[in-house]
Swiss-Prot record:
Alphabetical list of NCBIfam families matching this protein: GroEL, PRK00013.1, PRK12849.1, PRK12850.1, PRK12851.1
Annotated compartments: Cytoplasm
GO MF annotation: an example: ATP-dependent protein folding chaperone
Gene: groEL
Gene Ontology biological process: protein refolding
CDD domains given in the database record: GroEL
EC number: 5.6.1.7
Organism lineage string: Bacteria, Pseudomonadati, Pseudomonadota, Betaproteobacteria, Burkholderiales
Coiled-coil residues: none
Alphabetical list of SUPFAM superfamilies matching this protein: GroEL apical domain-like, GroEL equatorial domain-like, GroEL-intermediate domain like
A GO term from the CC aspect: cytoplasm
A Pfam family hit: Cpn60_TCP1
Protein name: Chaperonin GroEL
């Protein structure tokens, strides 16, 4: 086991706080509409330029191991806030630094760290309640655009494209962000349900200019096993042929004789069919087939439920207004499913989302809800260079998370004002001891820090602005983008309540843990022996030896 180095009390805290300050000072330069960029070196390729707090935090690793403890703890604040709320990482970092710095003064003056922590917890709980009272729901597309713009560092075009996407697919719809091919941001919306499986044979294509198999008013056969014998399919094919409507077959696979017969029938115009593989794998495949069945008003033909392909009738088949099958995906438009059944299915999946433990499962379940309830929107981010593209894409993703948080819990006035207004709830608080009162006082000072940082980054005098805003009421605050005071909600300077709340809770949680630490243990750096000198070229002096 490697040897350890241990530091105690103030000696440990001072070193740890030094690390907190290094990371926080790098991150907080990005806060506000006039925040600066940070350039991150990459081990290969071009450097990355970013204004995203969590991206900066994740890159920082300090040489001094005690300082690194502080940096990593604050990095955890940023990451947790990003995971929970999707934004507010810089605000959380600034708050954590403020609580640590103020708290350290009290600890050095002999206050009890445990009581300080209790006071901090009381003050934060009161501030969170006040934030909830200040919060107002987001109802209009304009408000969604404003929240997105603020989160994307005052880029109105990003806010607008996110608002447009939410208009098209609904607030529950899936919105994904991808690299674009042009200089402009683009929005693509897929109406209906789309899954990532295409036609099994190019001979199914009937629209050469779009390279798709387009089926109007088709039947949909959904089967959970492989189809290789055409005899199994014949009864249902004959019934569909009599109706003179096209047929889409979704099965685990269609191969051999069955596929060949379908292709020949299609080419000769006897029966217009297309076959695709079922989406997903394992249990997820079963669930997705069930989704498709409910959307189209059909039934999954499965041996598990006592059904067989030979006995399938037209009543077991789903229907849709139109289906387009491309090389790599299939889109079902306007399925004939019953509205109440679809609603019940969506409700069932939402219940599964609540219980899901992994992010991956949750994401896949949300995708299924969107495909049933709304649609899928793709924002393609355009930029001139790859470096700009990465930076812009990160901002779009941040803005998207922020707008989702705003829809979930509402919005409060931005620009650090909501935290200042929360001071009135903290001011009247009394702790059980003088040390707890010190913890409450500490939060009163810390909640000013985000506004101070925004103002400093904008090149103005922080103390003057903070006092002016405190003398105002409600939404009155300082708009750093214009350098003017006014009603921030009217001016569109909004923050999601969830983001502000999460930032404060996470910052106070980690910072108060740091203040109660009395010892720090790190691994000693091993002194590596100097590398052996290189052997001289050739084996001099060995010539003349007889072998």
């Amino acid at each position: 086991m490697a040897a350890k180095q241990v530091l105690f009390a103030d000696e440990a805290r001072v070193r740890i706080v030094r690390g907190v300050n290094v990371l926080a000072n790098a991150v907080k330069t990005t806060l506000g509409p006039k925040g600066r960029n940070v350039v991150l070196e990459r081990s290969f390729g071009a450097p990355t330029v970013t204004k995203d707090g969590v991206s900066v935090a994740k890159e920082i690793e300090l040489k001094d191991k005690f300082e690194n403890i502080g940096a990593q703890l604050v990095k955890d604040v940023a990451s947790k806030t990003s995971d929970n709320a999707g934004d507010g990482t810089t605000t959380a970092t600034v708050l954590a630094q403020a609580v640590v710095q103020e708290g350290l003064k009290y600890v050095a003056a002999g206050f009890n760290p445990i009581d300080l922590k209790r006071g901090i917890d009381k003050a934060v709980a009161a501030a969170v309640e006040e934030l909830k009272k200040l919060s107002k729901p987001v109802t209009t597309s304009k408000e969604i655009a404003q929240v997105g713009s603020i989160s994307a560092n005052s880029d109105a075009s990003i806010g607008q494209i996110i608002a447009d996407a939410m208009d098209k697919v609904g607030k529950e719809g899936v919105i994904t962000v991808e690299d674009g091919k042009s200089l402009e941001n683009e929005l693509d919306v897929v109406e209906g349900m789309q899954f990532d499986r295409g036609y099994l044979s190019p001979y199914f294509i009937n629209s050469p200019e779009k390279q798709v198999a387009a089926l109007d008013d088709p039947y949909v056969l959904i089967y959970d096993k492989k189809v290789s014998n055409i005899r199994d399919l014949l009864p249902v094919l004959e019934q569909v042929a009599k109706s003179s409507r096209p047929l889409l077959i979704i099965a685990e696979d269609v191969e051999g004789e069955a596929l060949a017969t379908l292709v020949v029938n299609n080419i000769r115009g006897i029966l217009k069919t297309t076959a695709v593989k079922a989406p997903g794998f394992g249990d997820r495949r079963k669930a997705m087939l069930e989704d498709i069945a409910i959307l189209t008003g059909g039934t999954v033909i499965s041996e598990e439920t006592g059904m067989s392909l030979e006995k399938a009738t037209l009543q077991d088949l789903g229907q849709a207004k139109r289906i387009e099958v491309a090389k790599e995906n299939t889109t079902i438009i306007d399925g004939a499913g019953d509205g109440k059944s679809i609603e019940a299915r969506v409700k069932q999946i939402r219940a599964q989302i609540e219980e899901a433990t992994s992010d991956y499962d949750r994401e896949k379940l949300q995708e299924r809800v969107a495909k049933l309830a709304g649609g899928v929107a793709v924002i393609r981010v355009g930029a001139a260079t790859e470096v700009e593209m990465k930076e812009k894409k990160a901002r779009v993703e941040d803005a998207l998370h922020a707008t989702r948080a705003a829809v979930e819990e509402g919005v409060v006035p931005g620009g650090g004002v909501a935290l200042l207004r929360a001071k009135q709830a903290i001011t009247g608080l009394k702790g059980d001891t003088a040390d707890q009162n010190a913890g409450i006082k500490l939060i009163l000072r810390a909640v000013e820090e985000p506004l101070r940082t925004i103002v400093t980054n904008a090149g103005d005098e922080a103390s003057v602005v903070v006092n002016t805003v405190l003398n105002g009421k409600g939404n009155y605050g300082y708009n750093a983008a214009t350098g003017e005071y006014g009603d921030l909600v009217e001016q569109g300077v909004l923050d999601p309540t969830k983001v502000t709340r999460t930032a404060l809770q996470n910052a106070a949680s980690v910072a108060s843990l740091l203040l109660t630490a009395e010892a720090a243990v790190v691994e000693l750096m091993e002194d590596k022996p100097a590398a052996a000198p290189a052997m001289p070229g050739g084996m001099g002096g060995m010539g003349g030896m007889d072998f």
